[in-house]
Amino acid sequence: DLMPKGNHHNMMLDTTPEIAAITTTFIAPSKTFNLAGLQSSTIVFDTVEHKDTYVADLKRQDIARNNCFSLVATMAAYRYGEEWLDQLLVYLEDNMKFIRQYCQENIPQLHPNDPEATYLCWIDARELGMDDDELQKFMVEKAGVAFGRGEEFGKGGSGFLRLNAACPRSVIEKALRQVKDAIATL
């Protein structure tokens, strides 16, 4: 749901009948509609037999429960949230553009990516020449900004920072200004 204009997500269920026959799809309104606290999700099964097996296992473990708020909120989000989601996508894209432009103009050592989906911007900080612990310590102690750590997603994430762009522009601007000022002291 959270994809920039022009991007498209291909679901495994839409590939081939053979793959669809062994695929179970989990979806949730949590990130898209900011409903994480309601713990709501939906599962799409390929066959009734797979669904019945899964439901029986949930019941056996005594975890097959929803709350009334999550059901109503999920239905409302998917039925009536399209206009809100369209506005959110524009806002997120504008925030991503701001991050890229700010870094290009003020923090050339940092290189934000163009995300294919979601509101998390990966920023390549390898040009600073710090290992992951030094980078995190520098950002927290000198810049006063706690980024998500890229290396938590594997070796390829080393030297990268994750910035949540789903917040007011003023918060992003303040964080980037603090990073700019801290890097200027190097």
Describe the residue ranges of each PLM region.
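PLP-dependent enzyme catalytic core of the Aspartate aminotransferase-like
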Residues: 138-147, 153-186
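Short, conserved active-site loop motifs that form the nucleotide-linked donor/cofactor pocket
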Residues: 23, 110, 145
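Conserved glycine-rich beta-strand-loop-beta hairpin in the small C-terminal domain of fold type I
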Residues: 75, 91-100, 112-125
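Conserved PLP phosphate-binding loop immediately N-terminal to the Schiff-base lysine helix
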Residues: 1-14
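Helix N-cap motif at beta-to-alpha junctions
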Residues: 47-48, 127-129, 168-170
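Conserved core segment of the aminotransferase class I/II
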Residues: 16-93, 100-101
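Short helix-capping segments at alpha-helix termini
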Residues: 16-19, 105-110, 186
